[in-house]
Amino acid sequence: MSTNGTLSKPEFPANAASKEYAASLDAADPFAGFREKFIIPSKANIASTKLAKPGLSSEPCIYFCGNSLGIQPKATQKYLEAQLDTWSSIGVCGHFTKIEDSPLKEWQNLAEQAAESMSKIVGAAPEEVAAMGTLTMNLHLLLASFFKPTATKRKILMDWKAFPSDHYAIESHLAWHHLDPKETMVLIGPDEGTYEIPTEKILSYIDQHADEAALILLPGIQYYTGQLFDIPKITEYAHSRGLIVGWDLAHAYANVPLKLHDWDVDFAAWCTYKYGNAGPGAMAGLFVHEKHGQVDYSEGEDAPKFRHRLTGWYGGDKSVRFKMDNKFKPIPGAGGYQISNPSAIDLACLCAALSVFDETSIAELRKKSVLMTAYLEYLLLKDTTDESRQFQIITPSDPAARGAQLSLLLKPGLLHKVAHRLQEAGIICDKREPGVVRVAPVPLYNTFTEIWMFVQQLKAALEG
């Protein structure tokens, strides 16, 4: 079983390259109404350097950058105002007082409100998810708990082009254990001249290093190429060879269906500001499988046994959290990995974003996403050849091996010119050195007509 099962690639009729056809797809879109739940930046505002209120310009930009930062849900202002009103009106009482007409729980239970909604997105029990921290911080906490090198098993396997923060985190944990990263960090990359890492190659690396590797950490979706890895197959195989398995789901969360519990993933972490739309630097999430989150009181209430982790008071069970007796009794599950009192303001933004997902499911959103990305690919490749195109799509063509993003590797020297031309045309997408434009139509708020318009502008920029 692959991460998303077998997906048939959509096929398009002869008139699919017309704007009218794109409009017909929009007319039939069951998610069209969700676009109204978001504030789309305007062309005028993205060209301005002054603080502006949304809605002052009626012409929206084309925002294909949800793989870097999602746009603001309209619910965010409502949730933030409710939180600020609670703080201003009752102060510290907000920790325990449930406000009847607020969309938010009291502060002591607010992280659980977010975790419950996130658990549906990642395919986990609510107790296996915690809303806390930021992505790299959470990876550090998880690695501190799960990376237990021995004299023989001390290597960590990861992908060759991991997001730099992941790379730094792994290096620092190896150094923390007095290990040389040059000897103990194993990078798995594609074959020369290619960009996709075949699942079989990952499995072969696991075989090659199984006797010396303690842990493997991979991205659910590779941030640069957009490749979606076969999470269940890799996890099952790594477990069979004795490795702990962790996943960085920064680009998979709220993008593709996940079943972390059923896939027996040991731990995972993700940010919520990309496809999750929770805001820049928003509070992140982590997953710890229930088998690792158990608390054993068989030797008495004062001698709980649990998986070692770095601890803080907010990971303590609520029944003893305020006793101040310095006897740590962790919350069972991922909640026991919490450290400090989380920001209620940040949680308000996260809960606002999650309220949109509570109205649908990732499985349903995925259907539209597969169609959108396939349509983008179709328009990009139509009436061109590998020789005539000034770009190469380095994202896998198989819908089951990618999410919303297509990564376009431009010919040398084109990146900055093309990115500038696109922004002048009111199109926001992400560029990554040395030459990649990452384009991510998001099913919650993007349209097929926008995809058609983007391709016209990209072709003009490449020809100009």
Curated annotation (Swiss-Prot):
Name of the gene encoding the protein in the UniProt record: bna5-2
A GO CC term assigned to this protein in UniProt: cytoplasm
Name assigned to this protein: Kynureninase 2
Catalysis: reaction(s): L-kynurenine + H2O = anthranilate + L-alanine + H(+); 3-hydroxy-L-kynurenine + H2O = 3-hydroxyanthranilate + L-alanine + H(+)
Taxonomic lineage from the root: Eukaryota, Fungi, Dikarya, Ascomycota, Pezizomycotina
Keyword RNA-binding: no
Organism: Aspergillus fumigatus (strain ATCC MYA-4609 / CBS 101355 / FGSC A1100 / Af293)
Any single biological process term in GO: quinolinate biosynthetic process
EC identifiers of the protein: 3.7.1.3
Cellular compartment(s): Cytoplasm
Residues engaged in binding pyridoxal 5'-phosphate: L135, T136, F163, P164, S165, D166, D248, H251, Y273, W313, N341
Major location (coarse): cytoplasm
Keywords per UniProt: Cytoplasm, Hydrolase, Pyridine nucleotide biosynthesis, Pyridoxal phosphate
Tree of life domain: Eukaryota
Pfam families: Aminotran_5, KYNU_C
Modified residues (N6-(pyridoxal phosphate)lysine): K274
Function: Catalyzes the cleavage of L-kynurenine (L-Kyn) and L-3-hydroxykynurenine (L-3OHKyn) into anthranilic acid (AA) and 3-hydroxyanthranilic acid (3-OHAA), respectively.
Record-stated family: Belongs to the kynureninase family.
Subunit-level organization: Homodimer.
